[in-house]
């Protein structure tokens, strides 16, 4: 059995930076993590062992933490919620991904220009919640079936950063089709690491019929990778660690693909990879040996993209007409 790794997979710079900030905290017991730092149960367990306090992403989100410091996760929070925490005397350690901040800026810009915002994403997801809390007029669209005819004459469309590009295109087309009367402005807020991983998995699916996807079960981008594999007709196994692999899954399999969401740690991916190689007979060989972002060329491109996005948020010409 051959083991073929996707050319782009695993931790993105937003997750990497959030983990670095958490690692530098000297007194974790004085810090409450506002939600899950990243959607990865192994990271959650590590944070708990270090003594971080934890706020869930559900019903207790409106409560004020007892600790003097609050760590904002890579998924971000609304300006309104951040102001509430500061007014309560909390010091915020903000690890919001730069590209999530871009999505927030896009939403607020549309709001201030009088647009009804259509947010393509998963209802209830913490990133979607954070963006929508700063809006007065909006709808969340998980798929094209949710699109309707709106009475608003100005419609602005943005995306949860981990939305599959194909789904965004489909929903955007449905909005235009059902609202020919409206002025529609679309802003692409899907992050580049998500696009890289989606493109890489498409290439992987041209080579294999069985794929192992590594990442948290509540990670949206990981679930989207698994769903895309399923859509393409592949047999897909979504695991969070190597211990979840079942050798019987690979009976008769000649080649297996390996990909991972942005919350999957490099060491976890490597452990899964080595476990797959151990199942191979004769021993498996990876066609791609250096997954992104260890590849210097891809890392440089991502760094340049991040700097461009930070600059773009501040530019008046940032918004694009559809």
Give residue spans per PLM region.
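The feature marks the mature, well-folded catalytic cores of soluble enzymes
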Residues: 1-322
């Amino acid at each position: 059995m051959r083991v073929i790794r996707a050319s782009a997979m695993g931790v993105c710079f937003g997750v990497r930076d959030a983990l670095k900030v958490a690692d530098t905290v000297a007194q974790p017991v004085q810090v409450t993590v506002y939600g899950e730092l990243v959607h990865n149960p192994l990271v959650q367990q590590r944070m708990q062992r270090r003594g971080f306090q934890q706020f869930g992403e559900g019903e207790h989100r409106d409560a004020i933490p007892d600790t003097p410091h609050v760590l904002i996760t890579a998924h971000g929070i609304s300006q309104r919620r951040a102001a509430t925490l500061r007014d309560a005397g909390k010091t915020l350690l903000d690890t919001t991904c730069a590209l999530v901040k871009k999505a927030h800026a896009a939403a607020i810009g549309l709001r201030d220009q009088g647009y009804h915002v259509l947010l393509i994403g998963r209802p209830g997801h913490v990133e979607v919640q954070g963006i929508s809390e700063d809006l007065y007029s909006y709808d969340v669209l998980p798929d094209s079936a949710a699109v309707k005819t709106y009475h608003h004459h100005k419609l602005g469309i943005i995306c949860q950063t981990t939305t599959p590009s194909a789904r965004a295109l489909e929903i955007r087309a449905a909005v235009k089709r059902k609202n020919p009367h409206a002025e529609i402005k679309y802003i692409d807020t899907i992050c580049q690491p998500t696009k890289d991983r989606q493109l890489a998995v498409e290439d992987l699916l041209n080579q294999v019929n069985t794929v192992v996807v590594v990442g948290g079960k509540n990670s949206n981008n990981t679930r989207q990778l698994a769903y895309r594999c399923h859509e393409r007709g592949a047999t897909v196994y979504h695991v969070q660690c190597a211990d979840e692999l079942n050798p019987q899954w690979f009976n008769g399999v000649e080649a297996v693909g390996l990909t991972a969401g942005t919350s999957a740690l490099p060491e976890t991916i490597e452990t899964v990879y080595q476990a797959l190689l151990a199942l191979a007979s004769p021993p498996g060989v990876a066609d791609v040996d250096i997954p992104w972002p260890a590849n210097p060329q891809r890392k440089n491109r991502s760094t340049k993209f991040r700097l461009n996005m930070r600059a773009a948020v501040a530019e008046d010409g940032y918004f694009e007409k559809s």
